[in-house]
Structure formats: structure tokens, C-alpha cells
Amino acid sequence: MRQLRALGIAALILAAIFPLQSQGKKTVLQYWSWDSSVKKQNEDIIAKFEAQNPGVKVELTTLETTEYWVKIRLLANQGKLPDVFNMSSGYLEEWARAGLVRDLGPSIDRDLDKKSFYMSVLDAGKDIAGTGKYCALPYALVTTVLYYNKDMFDKAGVAYPSASWTWEDFRKAAKKLTIVKDGKTQQYGFWFFGRYSNVESWVFANNGRLIDPATNSYKPDANAIEAMRFLTDLVLADKVAPAKKEMSAFRYQDVFPQGAAAMWVDGSWFIDNNRKIAGDKIRWDIAELPRGPKGDGKSVYGWPDYVSISPNTPNADLAWKFAKFVAGEGVSLDMYMAGKIPTYRPITESPAFLEKGQQPANKGLLIKQAAKAFRTSYTLGWSEWRGYGPAESLGLNGIIDAIIDGETSFDEGMNKADTNINKILKRYYK
């Protein structure tokens, strides 16, 4: 962290050393993207931008996510960041505190068409950055939803989830949807494990929090504890959801579309996966999460993907103009996999976004959620303490998995989480 901060200062010094980047008479912008699946769409956006801005050349670098973060961190350490680059919610605070992203607040105040963007999403980024500044411009967001198998609901005679569902309604439905024959469970009512999007969705639906923002410490409140106990009880007491180890034959995202469970809570981006895996073999839809006993329904668990601007770009105004274009009027719906929500409202609120005739029929729910306040648990070191990606078996993810796998008690797991996670956070927030 201190290394990145020092290098952020170095980057500003380098800005005074290196002259305006040019190619002949053209002003050159460097744009880095982590998504090779939309390389062609990005090239189309760039072509439109260049046509509207004669004398400008945008050079695109596209890398897969893992390689992207390795290489862009190297550039940050060298003070050679591209003018505009993709930024993740999971790393925004680290980069903002290190001074490696430009403060966009003055530009947003000056000429961003706020009516055309979901400002709640921009505000979420401001909160995640932890600096009180807008350090990135969101171009897409995701939320979490309740996926449910309509065929299984119909067969069990259970009414589809509604906005009035309570946690007890959910539990009762999960029990009716669980099928046991000869002592073996053939179909579960629900599926989850310690994954962040599986757990925090319920924490926030109960108006809970995991992180104390005043101390940057892991200190789950009573509402969060209630949510995590509710989830683990679905496995250990109600027997309506499996232990994680029981589903080891599946990719976690395939348990629901392959028909092993009737309900599942995860990111809206899995709409795309469900379509590919399930096809037309099952009828399914999405609903909002049941509101917890302490929930008020005013916020939703969700987070954006962004573009950020280098603090030492010699072309700050032009970089801002391009960032607005790539997050707004320059994009088209085919830039987004099903389930990702454009932050540019004219696209999201167009009839094409609803994809009538395709599952899920209730895709309009995502538009309603985009207008709500967003909550997350992102901090410095989030992937480490949460147990994300390569660290999945560690952190809170691993602890919750151990609870539902019967390897530790709930109270023992919560105590372990408190000790281990706060050791990690203390390293980052000194």
C-alpha cells in the first residue's frame, strides 16, 4: 500500500517530464480494457469517437482479467498508466488512496449529464473509494437476485416469490421444494455457500453490515449475524440446502440451471450462464430477495465496473471526454452480457434491454434495482479477508463453508472470522 502511494506521487512528477503523447499530428489516448469478449464493440466505440474528434487516435489494449491486473500494476509502479483504463470496485479504494486515479468530481460537476446516468451508482463508487471523491466513472453495474425454477414451483404447488415474501415465507417454500426419497435428497429447495454474493445479499436484505466504517474493522452487527445464522440453519437445521461438499461435482454456477436446486441467490450476470446451461429445458425467472426482519427494501447489494483516468495523463480533458463516451452515449446494448446493467439510462430503460421473449421474463427488476441505493462490503484487502478467487477456501468464505460442512460450529466460526479478518484489516489500515 505504501509502495503504491509513493509511486502515485512519482507518477505526478513524471507528468512534468514526459511531453504530450502524439502520433504525427494526432493526439493519442491509451485505453486499457479487461474484457476480450467485447473487443470488437470497444473498437466500434473507438471508431465512433475518433470520427467525432478529428486528430484523435485511441489505442486499445485488451487483456484477460488476471493478466490485466498484473500488467497495469506494473505500469502504475513505473508511473506509466494508460490515460483511461477499466477499474474494479474491489480495487478502487486501494488505487484511490494511493493517488493512482484522477479525481473526477470537478468534471462530473462541470458537464456530466446527470439525468442520463444512475447517480446512485456514481455515489456507490464514491463510497467505495473511501476518499470522499469520485475516482471512477461507472459504465455497468450488477446486483444480486433470487433465481427460481418455475417448473419446480408449479409441481410443488408453491406460489412464485413476490415482493411481499418474508424470510419465513422463503423457508416454507424451500421446505416444500425439497424432495427426499429413501432417505436421500433428490432436489434441494435452495443452494448457497460462503461466496460473497451468496451471503452479503442476505446481510444487506436485513439492513445489516459486516464492516464498521468508523474503525475499518470486521464487526458484523446483530442484523448481519441474524442473516448468516438464517442461511446456515437452512443447511444444518432445515435440511433444505446442501452442504457445500455435497455439490463438489458441479460448478457452483451450474447447480441451479442443471436442476439440482429450486432457488439460488447470486449476481445478475448469471442470467447469461443460466441461458447457456439450461437453455429451454427449464422455465425460470428472477425476483428480489425476501426482505429480512430488519430490512426496509431501500437499498440493494450491487457494485459497478468503471473507467478511471490516470492522474498524470497529459490529455485530461480529452481523457474525460472519452471516458464519458465509453460509459455513456458511445456504447450499445451488445456491449453488455445478459444481466449486466448499463449505467447510461437511455440504454437500460430502452425496450431492447428487457429482451422480451427470453428468460427471465422479469428482467425489468434490474432497472428497479439500479435506481436504489447500493451497499457493498469492499475494503482494502477485501479479496483476502473475504476469500475471493484463489483465496476462496480462506477468509469468510471458507469459514461459512466449514460451518455448513459441519466442520465447526456457528459460534466458533464467527469467533474465528472476527480474529482472522481483523488481523488482515489491521495490516491494511495502519
What are these language model-derived features?
Residues 74, 83, 112-152, 188-189, ...:
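A structural signal for short loop-to-beta-strand junctions that line the ligand-binding cleft
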Residues 89-145, 285-287, 357-362, 369-371:
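Hinge/lid segment of periplasmic solute-binding proteins
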Residues 47-119, 124, 154-157, 255, ...:
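Extracytoplasmic "Venus flytrap"/periplasmic binding protein-like
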Residues 129, 364-420:
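C-terminal capping/gating helix-and-loop segments adjacent to ligand/active sites or protein-protein/ligand interfaces
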Residues 36-57, 396:
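Short, polar/charged alpha-helical segment
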Residues 173-176, 214-245, 275, 289:
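Glycine-centered hinge/linker elements that transmit conformational signals in sensory
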Residues 25-36, 56-61, 84, 135, ...:
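Short, well-ordered beta-strand elements
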Residues 269-272, 309-390:
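Mature extracytoplasmic/periplasmic domains
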